[in-house]
């Protein structure tokens, strides 16, 4: 069966190769998409039982029951979307398994009326690992946020263009299977390119360009995007001029958020902030969510349920005596609220009675 599915996938890829590639959406098409879609308000998910995205997807780690319970929490808040990081390493090990797990994820999200934004690649690291490995993952390090997070596909593959043919197959296979899937509302091709890459940053940017090219060859009905996450002109000239809709990350207080938001809105395309919520920095729900609501800019906070990733702590910094406030997340591991007032503000924004 596995061989048959792989063979079928190869046949579909061959058909795609004969099709005319798509182009960046026109301004008119992007604006029409924005008018046809709701105000998106949701969250980034690392399930509480997972320390990283290998843990989320690999055999023995993928946990439908955990997902179902967390999606119920999100649905009860009125959230209508979720952003989830995929992991190339799991796909490479067994494409059939990965695609089935992803399909199950989409089913569960759909049951909770959540649209999905998959993230295909990611350069971020906050602990020692620069490349993902299968099997048992590292345990959380007390006092260190996202200690066990790993990039996808990993810095070694990003820097080695000889491996990019394998990455092309992954991108095209995943998108092809869901190119017209209404459960997916945006394809986020690459999270925070060049993050922690140092002298290898140019390789990240080269891969970003390839990702857009590969995805355009599939020509999905959903928009493509890569976020604006810092002030690096070299990065932003690529991502803001290639994306069909504009996405950005902002962990600043209200004044800084309004400034970045204004710059993004001026580009004339639909805009979604796909990462925010940094309570110690004043980027909190009482001050920031109303800004996104009043402007109609989409909002996706970082974190729903706190867990092994320890995203309540500062990332990449050892803080053994941390006393809060939490950086990210809305619920403790037992699903009790961190701050009931935050939940009330979210429900007001989403229209939940």
PLM feature spans:
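Aromatic/acidic polysaccharide-binding cleft in carbohydrate-active enzymes
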Residues: 289-334
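Positively charged n-region of N-terminal signal peptides that target proteins for export
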Residues: 1-4
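Catalytic domains of carbohydrate-active enzymes that cleave complex glycans
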Residues: 348-353
